[in-house]
A protein has these predicted regions:
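Jelly-roll (double-stranded beta-helix
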Residues: 1-295
Length: 295
């Protein structure tokens, strides 16, 4: 069993642009070695928006050196980027964007969702890239809900979606640069599940909704992060009520992390170079782009 290193909770939300009230459950600023290859996770909502004809969200902004993973639970988003990719991301869908050598993108509530209003709930996860891949070509993967395997958990305890990696012979559709698992789970009240996590991997359990007991020891509630030691295998989760969770595990990238704003590289010199490349147009450009705050 993996040892629990700590439980962190983020009760306070802040706004990203005018469309995303988020709670930052972890960042590389203070947990880098314990969460690698993951860098950051923001949990937005659930938040009710009234109908509007205005665009809500975040206008064009750059990224370099990592990937962003957006998981939508409720609501609908519209994405566009400088590679020409784009589209709608609805409930159950996942957007896996590789910034790598540089990308410019924007994220807004979709016109349909803005027009009707409703509840928005989503997660954005940042995934680091090893130094050898930080200058790879930018890319974009749309992972539709119907293409993500759903596995029934033992004892009718709930379900697990394999977004990345593998679970009991079911492989997720996301293409990753390093070995990792990203599992999206729903547990029924009273269910207990044993999750296989390899020794040597960093692992974190993200509790989005509900209350759970971990390894029979400690309880964690909504909007909280449970960190585990690299040693040991398996994590036991008991749902004290219906719960929504993410299990993140991966082989650590034991390299220097230097981040500033939308860039995550390995040195200050690379950060300075990234700003210069962005300002001189080396990230490409978007048609009909709109200014906005960075996320």
């Amino acid at each position: 069993m993996k040892t629990i290193l700590g439980i962190h909770r983020s009760p306070h939300a802040h706004w990203v642009g005018d469309g995303f009230p988020v709670r930052s459950l972890f960042t590389y600023d203070n947990l880098a070695s314990k969460i690698s290859p993951f860098l950051l996770l923001d949990y937005a909502g659930p938040h009710d928006f009234t109908s509007t004809s205005a665009r809500r969200g975040v206008g064009q902004h750059p990224h370099r050196g990592f990937e962003t993973v957006t998981i939508v639970y409720q609501g609908e988003l519209e994405h566009r980027d400088s590679t020409g990719a784009g589209g709608l991301i609805g409930p159950g869908d996942v957007q896996w964007m590789t910034a790598a050598n540089g990308i410019i993108h924007e994220e807004f509530h979709s016109p349909g969702f803005a027009r009707t209003g409703g509840t928005l709930e989503m997660v954005q996860l940042w995934v680091n890239l090893p130094a050898r891949d930080k200058r790879a070509a930018a890319g974009y993967q749309t992972l539709l809900a119907e293409d993500i395997p759903v596995v029934a958990l033992d004892g009718e305890g709930g379900s697990l979606r394999v977004i990345a990696g593998e679970y009991r012979g079911h492989s997720g559709p996301a293409r990753t640069f390093t070995a990792m698992d990203v599992w999206d789970m729903r547990l029924h009240a009273g269910a207990t599940v044993q999750l296989p996590v390899a020794a040597g991997r960093n692992a974190a359990l993200v509790v989005l909704r509900g209350n759970v007991r971990i390894n029979g020891e400690r309880e964690a509630g909504p909007a909280s992060l449970v960190l585990f030691d690299r040693a040991g295998e398996d994590v036991a989760v008991e749902a004290l009520e219906g719960a929504s969770l993410l299990l993140l595990s991966g082989e650590p990238i034991d390299e220097p992390i230097v981040g500033y704003g939308p860039f995550v590289m390995n040195s200050q010199a690379e950060i300075a170079e990234s700003f210069d490349d962005f300002h001189t147009g080396r990230f490409g450009q978007m048609q009909d782009a709109r200014d906005g705050a960075a996320h």
